[in-house]
Amino acid sequence: MKKCFLVCLAVLGLVACTPDEERIDLSGVWQFALDREGLVKPGDAMSDTIVLPGTTDTNRKGDAIAWKGETTHLSRPYSYKGRAWYRRTVTIPEKWAGENVYLTLERTKPSEVYVDGVLVGSANNISTPQRFDLTAALTPGVHELAIMVDNGSGVPWQVYDSSHAYTENTQTNWNGIIGEIALTTSLPEKEAIPVHPAFKDFHIEGQQFFAGGHPIYLRGRHDACVWPLTGHVAMDVDSWRHYFKVCEEYGLNHVRFHSWCPPEAAFVAADESGIYLQPELPFWGDVNPKDTVLMDFLMAEGEAIMREYAHHPSFRMFALGNELRGSIPKMTEFIEHFRAMAPDKIYTLSSNYYLGYQGVKPGMDFFVTCRVGGEGWGNYGTHTRGSFSFADAADGGMINHFYPNTRMNFEEGCSLAEVPIISHETAQFQTYPNYDEIAKYTGALYPYNMEIFRDRLEKAGMADQAKAFHQASGQWSLRLYKQDIEMDLRTPNMAGFQLLDLQDYPGQGSAYVGILDAFLDTKGLCTSEEWRGFCAPVVPLLIADKFCYTNEEVLHADVQIANYGEESLKGKTVTWSLGEKSGAIVVPTDEFGLIDAGVLDIPLADYQQATQLKLTLQVEGTKEFNTDDIWVYPAKNDLERLKEMVVITRTLTADVARRLENGESVLLMPDASEQTVGGLFQTDYWNYRMFKTISENNNRHVSPGTLGILTDPAHPLFASFPTEMHTNWQWFPVVKASHPFKLDNTAADYRPIVQVIDNIERNHKLGLVFEFAVGKGKLLVVMSDLDKAAEYPEGEQFYLSVLRYMTSQHFAPKTVITVADFHRLMTTPVVAGEIGKLNNISPYKAEDYK
């Protein structure tokens, strides 16, 4: 019998079956056998059954989970790696005599296809359908069709370690066949697809993308193939319609698929929605021309992606993978080869190749990056996003480092390139997990990691605070996301961003960085309407030097509009309000892009008390409005007088202890470095465990690893310092000068007035402000240098509010300890569990990126 072959069409795309095609649907129950030793033959008895489309996981086949201690990612209740057999009989009708017969496996792993026990084809493409010409083998009559799928071999080893087509961090390395499984008498033919207005005349001018005759801005997200119910990508159009609907609700118009390519259904839904897609090769690592196995595999995958999907209007951009390093000439060779196949696309070597240190190279139409070229440590002039790990940028980047403002942007970094710059994996601010989410995992994956994190918190005596930790860290994360996104929007020469992420990433140490959970459901942090206030085609932007003022100042700010909508705004008004004050600005220009709308000068003398206000901007004709918090404090206060009314010290000396025991009030601001963590303003980046490991490997400072504060705004300590339960911009001077204390050795129910939320690895009870009754006196401990913080109006106001509290009747600590007890608390080491090592595929070693 003539051996059949994998069909490779020399066309740029394939669509649904033609109307005159005959089709036999092969979905349903198949015979099944695991082949752990590689000894099963296609004709052997197979006593088990399985439902296809599906995987061994969704059918609960393979090895039942034995160890439930995994915290790096979600767990598979049933898993299998190796060869597995799927077999069934097929009946070819007489009317198919003389017809071609093709088998389509829309998405699977390396496979072998047998008809009546004879091998008739094999394939190892994982990004596109596998199609086999079985004409010679499937004549009219009854035949036995057997398919061996191997998720343990057949692709280069680097793909298992890196690609989101395989990784256990998200999609899992499943075995099975998903999507369409069918026999047909013809192959899909390329059809014309209606072009959504968003894609018309898409091109590049200078550093901007254009479509429809005007500049557009790519407001994107990173996608890592997170489908927690199935453990594999959705293959139906409706699921992808829902996916893109959520993206649109949150103002996004772009998705980057990190080291993988989505299926046909995604492109169909994106074509309908007007969402720009950037698929990638299934790779993250070193491009080594000498590794011909890897190079040939990646070239074949790219060619297959172009043949299969390039006709889709939504497929506009392509990259060779994630954070590649190695041979730039080889990367360029790949790009030019794919460009010849699909010249209407735009190409880049890799998302964040060489972590951005190599800058732009010939052949790159655009640059997805976190920086443009190298920089000295502590120099942020090349950066194109606001947050970094401590391993990758001094002090974790610009947002954590600089005094809060709405003026800083990435214009300097973007000016180092001449192509459009897209901010790579923007934000990555952690939120403490929501353990109510555990109940939602009813499918192929289970969050034993979340159960372990919950148990750790309970062991630390803080289980009752889990929801508050989630809400407080999430609200602060939301504001940090807003800042990072607006830094992009107020950069005139930036072309877009790709968030990491709108959705939680449940792997790589468990990175709860999403505004939505892993199911794309809300976490209750904000509505989509509130989010679109700063993430939409048209966004009004407050450009100011600070958020905090005294009442002797005038709030001076510029107003800009990121106008990437479809029409000119000339003559339209931008209304503003601040408390009871309001006004309007008339837009003076008909330009698109980032435009100057006008200036605000708002006197603040009316505010005689410390006040938190909302400054709101809204562009005429838009539903959304953008809101920033503003704080106004009295310029004159009685801080110096109040300092004389309490004992202020950095050390609890014998004399101070005696005065405390005899009834005086003591404010202790210790310089202690033992039993403390550092002061981190933003929530920790991505995942503490992973970047702790990377920082230590590279002799970098380890991030303090915290997730913001938790407090009670109604506590009398805040009578003169308006606050929410969470960190906000007015906390910057106090937090940056802080070193929160580990209160693990206090009673389980003891709570500090201002608590700092720790990460899921350590679970320390961290105190920024806490109090005790000692003898006849009262002790307030502030783990921050308030004299340093008082250099700013908000820091001075916090100091004032602390002292007003201490000199009021409300200062009445309930927890009683002795001086000796307090000394033991401050000096007794806290017993902490060991944090496991977790490395990343990108090594972050400077010598690897030069």
Report residues per predicted region.
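Beta-strand-rich binding/interaction modules
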Residues: 101, 113-115, 186, 190-195, ...
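N-terminal carbohydrate-binding accessory modules
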Residues: 19-21, 37, 190-247, 268, ...
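Catalytic beta-strand/loop cores that center a nucleophilic Ser/Cys/Thr
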Residues: 398-405, 674-676, 692-793, 810-849
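Substrate-binding/catalytic cleft of secreted carbohydrate-active enzymes
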Residues: 244, 254-515
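Aromatic-rich peripheral "rim/lid" segments of glycoside hydrolase catalytic domains that contact
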Residues: 341, 500-565, 829-830
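Short alpha-beta junction capping motif
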Residues: 644-689, 776-778, 782, 802
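Accessory beta-strand-rich segments of carbohydrate-active enzymes
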Residues: 24, 32-38, 61, 76-77, ...
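Accessory carbohydrate-binding/adhesion or oligomerization-edge regions at the termini
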Residues: 18-69, 146-156, 176-183, 802, ...
